[in-house]
Amino acid sequence: MPRKLPFLVSHLIKNVPYVCRPSVANGVFPALGIHLNQVKFELIDGTEKEATFMSVNIAPQSSGKSAVNKPVEYILADIVEHDKVNREREQEWKDSMNKKGANKEKPKRPDDLCVQVLVSDMTNAAFVQRMNDAKGKYLYTNLEEIELLRQLHTNGTKDVGKIICLCFDNGMYGQERVGTQSVTARVALRWNWNASTTILKGQKFFRGSLVDGTLSRLNISTIIPDKTKPFVYGKYDEQFAADLKPYIDRLNEARGTVVCREALRMAKRMLDKCQREGDLTGDDVYQDLSYRAVTIAYLKAMVLYIAHGMQWSKEIEKFAEWSLNYDLWCKCHYFGDDMTDEKQKERVVHKRGRQNMLEMLPERFTEDQVVEVRRRLGLDDDAKNMLRVWVYRKYIQKDNDSGIYRKYLNKKC
């Protein structure tokens, strides 16, 4: 991490163990982001984006993944207090509903019950109801375990990748029901969240959805245990909350489209650097991940820009650059090999059906040459059965003495 950090980041990580600070420095942004309401940022491609953050901490068991919880608790304190009032009002409405007889007119549910901080155990209907109640505000959940994402449904299926894509793009989400007491709503998905997982479970969870844009929309962090450093937490008290309050207040007060030319120039430099490194190394995975990683780092810089009173600083810039490199390192380190494998399979599927293996072979060829062609297409090495079929169908003939195969003229398989 940079030695000198923006005050807000430095303040939020100062009480967590040293080895946890990089992950916490990234993990606080989902909670910071939900304080922004009706705020958009101009991107380098001319579009606008809201402060959407989905942070996943992938680290060994008992490594301190919960270190982010206390800073997040203080960040969300004002919103949780507001939620408490609306939760009580909602419970009063439920109680009055239960007191009414079956033939009595039921009281209408209040339409201003905005609750932004949700528990991790929720039904899809409850989630849709909370989004509808929020009226454009962001929701937040600390999912603890990444598997809890499967509670939610898109198109009747537990499609985690689709939910992540909708979150990042603020896509439309909801459900359609016919019952009078059922939740029917369809709204733009504004939901920031934190989740954690162990390394093997995380790799298994995302396997099969690494090249469809799912991983690139996440912000990944990790914890590398260091047994030589003591695992000690600092003190969270009223002074900690008081020092944090001005920064939270500025986020709450912000409105409209926020533009910072220094931040845009930084984002352009970061993207150019990533593309240059990808070109020089020939690393397709790095290039695929870099564009959205730059966007995520830029959004962090803009949140800090607002929180620090619309003041740009070298500390914000250096932190954003470090955050980008850290995010890309974590993604490539934990998922790079699997992404490469999935990309290769995708290429094979794309080509399959359009490439005639017989046309890829010379007029005279051996079984070894057929095996090589099959490998290039991602097939297994067993060519014997295919060659027998080709001989039977008179696409080729075999010289039993030499073992050489020869194509029949004007024949194609």
Predicted segments, located by residue:
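Phosphate-handling catalytic cores of nucleic-acid transaction enzymes
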Residues: M1-C413
